[in-house]
C-alpha cells in the first residue's frame, strides 16, 4: 500500500504471492449508492416520523479531557421521564429513546432533559391509531395536515460557550494552583469514607478511655 501521511517509510519484504493479498476498494462507489438508497427507503417507510430516529438526551462527555462538551446520549433515564410526566412504555411509541440503566448525577442535567422532553412533547404532532376514533392527546385534523417529515436531527444539541470580557488578573488568581486544587479535591472525595470511619473509631476509643 502507498505511504500515508508523515509515518516511517517502510521497506516491505513481499513474499508469499503478495499480489493475491492486495486490498482493493472497487466496490466503494456502488456501496455509497446502496447506502443512500437504503436511507431513502427507510425515510419513506417510517414517514412521517423523523428521519434521524428518536429524540436523544443531552449528556456530558466522560473524562476530564472532554467533559466541557455536551452531546446526544443513548436514552432518557426513568427519573427524567417521571418528572416530565411521560410513561416509559408510551415514550418509546412517540419517538423518545429510553435507557433504564442511566442514572442522573446532577440536578442540572436532570432539569435540562426534563425541559427537553416537555418542549418535544409540546411540539409533537401525534397521529391517532384509528383516524375515525381519535383519543385524548392525539393532534387535531388541522395539525395533522401541517405535519412534515423532519430530515435533520430532532432538536439538535449545540455547545454554547460564553465569552468572557478581558479584565485584570487579580493577585489571588495568580497564586491559585488549579492542578493541585483539583488533585486535592479528588483525594478528599476518594478518602472521605475512610477518614469518616477513622474519626468514628477514634471517637469511640476516647469514650472507652474516659470510662
From Swiss-Prot:
It comes from Gallus gallus (Chicken). Keywords: Cytoplasm, Ribonucleoprotein, Ribosomal protein. Transmembrane segments: none annotated. This is Large ribosomal subunit protein eL13. InterPro entries: Ribosomal_eL13, Ribosomal_eL13_CS. GO terms for molecular function: RNA binding; structural constituent of ribosome. Component of the ribosome, a large ribonucleoprotein complex responsible for the synthesis of proteins in the cell. The small ribosomal subunit (SSU) binds messenger RNAs (mRNAs) and translates the encoded message by selecting cognate aminoacyl-transfer RNA (tRNA) molecules. The large subunit (LSU) contains the ribosomal catalytic site termed the peptidyl transferase center (PTC), which catalyzes the formation of peptide bonds, thereby polymerizing the amino acids delivered by tRNAs into a polypeptide chain. Gene3D superfamilies: 1.20.5.110. Component of the 60S large ribosomal subunit (LSU). Pfam families: Ribosomal_L13e. GO terms for biological process: bone development; translation. Belongs to the eukaryotic ribosomal protein eL13 family. GO terms for cellular component: cytosol; cytosolic large ribosomal subunit; endoplasmic reticulum; nucleolus; synapse. It is found in: Cytoplasm. The keyword DNA-binding does not apply.
